[in-house]
Swiss-Prot record:
Miscellaneous notes: Unlike the carbohydrate-specific transporters of the PTS, the complex DhaKML has no transport activity.
Gene expressing this chain: dhaM-2
Stated name of the protein: PEP-dependent dihydroxyacetone kinase 2, phosphoryl donor subunit DhaM
Assembly and oligomerization: Homodimer. The dihydroxyacetone kinase complex is composed of a homodimer of DhaM, a homodimer of DhaK and the subunit DhaL.
A GO-annotated cellular component: cytoplasm
Keyword hit for Magnesium: no
Length: 125
């Protein structure tokens, strides 16, 4: 199984996207909402993102999709907090949040290999 971590300044955005992806692919992909600061405010929280990634220990690959600049910085900071095993299987993806996460989830149903997912994401703009 793969995991997809959704990072946005808005919890509502990541929860809505999580709902949409789960509706399409079911529970075959572990989708995690990491939007907002964790206390209902807009913003990002690197500690929360790292804690959410830590729930993915059973995943073969973990992909992080972010919305805008500082969300990417928070995701990068979260990676610095991970142990080596989790870090080695975690990738921040340079793709649009909605289209990228959706494409990765659907592609994982066809071919869950990291190479296949990354290749399919090259078509997402």
């Amino acid at each position: 199984m793969i995991s997809i971590v959704l990072v946005s300044h808005s919890q509502k955005i990541t929860e809505g996207l999580q709902e949409m992806i789960v509706e399409m692919v079911g529970d075959t992909v572990h989708i995690i909402s990491s939007g907002g600061t964790g206390d209902g405010r807009l913003g990002t929280n690197a500690l929360m993102i790292a804690d959410n990634i830590a729930t993915c220990t059973n995943s073969e690959h973990i992909y992080i999709f972010c919305d805008i600049g500082s969300a990417i910085l928070s995701a990068e900071t979260a990676l610095e907090l991970l142990d080596t095993e989790l870090l080695e299987k975690t990738t921040i993806i340079d793709a649009p949040l909605v289209e990228g996460a959706f494409t990765a989830a659907v592609q994982s149903l066809v071919n869950p290999s990291k190479e296949a997912i990354l290749q399919e994401l090259t078509n997402v703009h």
